[in-house]
């Protein structure tokens, strides 16, 4: 089963349904990494000052909102955090509407809702009620410190929550400035009949197994072919990147090592001084680490 990305409850009236949120989509797109063609080293990203062209360190970057042309209002991290909505771990239903009333352009990201063992019956009750009434539930939910408008709807035996775009983020059709040739088209009966006949001839069932991303398939086939021919470039990863990825483990190991060292030194101080001197004479001097010779890369 897919990993839950959020746990909480659906809430409407006095009803609470414990649920977990599972992503209903996955990305299979080709991931192209940037490489320096001269050395096949990975190419990263830098924060560049657009005026001076120089790199800017993270501690010198602040966040600003454009207020007027070339004029910004700067907000601190504390001010930004204070604007985040309080996470309630609930999907708060505030209305039930006909699904046809939700414009297609408002639909954004779907998620599956899986019930907790304690709430399976009431989960099924909400699903069946939505089916019987042909309604969807509108709700507010906070995910990753952001408040979202959402629609909860039935899908076969499950419930789905679809994140909706805020109406202010969706453009009206008036922005297209359609002419009367489109809005009040004068179509003849024969034109309509031929179009309907064409649609009828091309009508088919939804067959998801037959719909493929041909670009993805061709790229991966090309990768497999070139790999089979031995056309593979060795890329040296940045050791600093690996250190950052394992930072938590390194920090924990360092803490444990220092804790053990602290205990060891404390126990040594309790031993007689004479024994300490004998131990110092018997222990060999630490060897200096060997210096590695650097080999230049061919450009």
Curated annotation (Swiss-Prot):
One of its GO terms (molecular function) is double-stranded DNA binding. InterPro entries: Ku70/Ku80_beta-barrel_dom (IPR006164), Prok_Ku (IPR009187), SPOC-like_C_dom_sf (IPR016194). Residues 10-188 form the Ku domain. It holds the Pfam family Ku. CDD domains: KU_like (cd00789). The keyword DNA-binding applies. The keyword Kinase does not apply. Residues 273-283 have a biased composition (Basic and acidic residues). It comes from the Bacteria. Residues 284-299 have a biased composition (Basic residues). Residues 227-249, 261-299 are annotated as: Disordered. GO terms for biological process: DNA recombination; double-strand break repair via nonhomologous end joining. Keywords: DNA damage, DNA recombination, DNA repair, DNA-binding. Belongs to the prokaryotic Ku family. HAMAP family: Prokaryotic_Ku (MF_01875). With LigD forms a non-homologous end joining (NHEJ) DNA repair enzyme, which repairs dsDNA breaks with reduced fidelity. Binds linear dsDNA with 5'- and 3'- overhangs but not closed circular dsDNA nor ssDNA. Recruits and stimulates the ligase activity of LigD. Homodimer. Interacts with LigD. NCBIfam families: Ku_bact. This is Non-homologous end joining protein Ku. It comes from Pseudomonas syringae pv. tomato (strain ATCC BAA-871 / DC3000). The gene is ku.
């Amino acid at each position: 089963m897919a990993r839950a990305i959020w746990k909480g409850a659906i809430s409407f009236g006095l009803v609470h349904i414990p649920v977990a949120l599972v992503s209903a989509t996955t990305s299979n797109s080709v991931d192209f990494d940037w490489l320096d063609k001269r050395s096949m080293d990975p190419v990263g990203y830098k924060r560049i000052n657009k005026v001076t062209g120089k790199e800017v360190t993270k501690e010198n970057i602040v966040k600003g909102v454009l207020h007027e042309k070339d004029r910004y209002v700067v907000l601190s991290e504390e001010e930004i955090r204070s604007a985040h909505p309080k996470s309630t771990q609930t999907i708060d239903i505030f209305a039930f509407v006909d699904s046809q009333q939700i414009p297609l352009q408002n639909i954004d990201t779907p998620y599956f809702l899986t019930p907790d063992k304690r709430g399976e019956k009431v989960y099924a009750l909400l699903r069946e009620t939505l089916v019987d009434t042909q309604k969807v539930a509108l709700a507010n939910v906070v995910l990753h410190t952001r408040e979202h408008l959402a629609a909860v709807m039935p899908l076969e035996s499950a419930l789905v929550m679809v994140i909706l775009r805020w109406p202010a983020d969706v453009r009206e059709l008036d922005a297209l400035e359609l002419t009367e040739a489109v809005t009040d088209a004068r179509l003849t009966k024969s034109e309509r009949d031929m179009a309907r006949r064409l649609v009828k001839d091309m009508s088919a069932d939804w067959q998801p197994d037959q719909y493929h991303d041909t670009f993805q398939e061709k790229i991966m086939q090309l990768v497999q072919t070139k790999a089979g021919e031995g056309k593979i470039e060795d890329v040296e990863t940045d050791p600093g990147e690996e250190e950052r990825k394992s930072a938590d483990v390194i920090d924990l190991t360092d803490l444990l090592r220092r804790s053990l060292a602290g205990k060891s030194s404390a126990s040594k101080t309790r031993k007689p001084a004479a024994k300490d001197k004998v131990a110092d004479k018997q222990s060999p001097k630490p060897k200096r680490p060997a210096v590695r010779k650097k080999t230049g890369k061919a450009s």
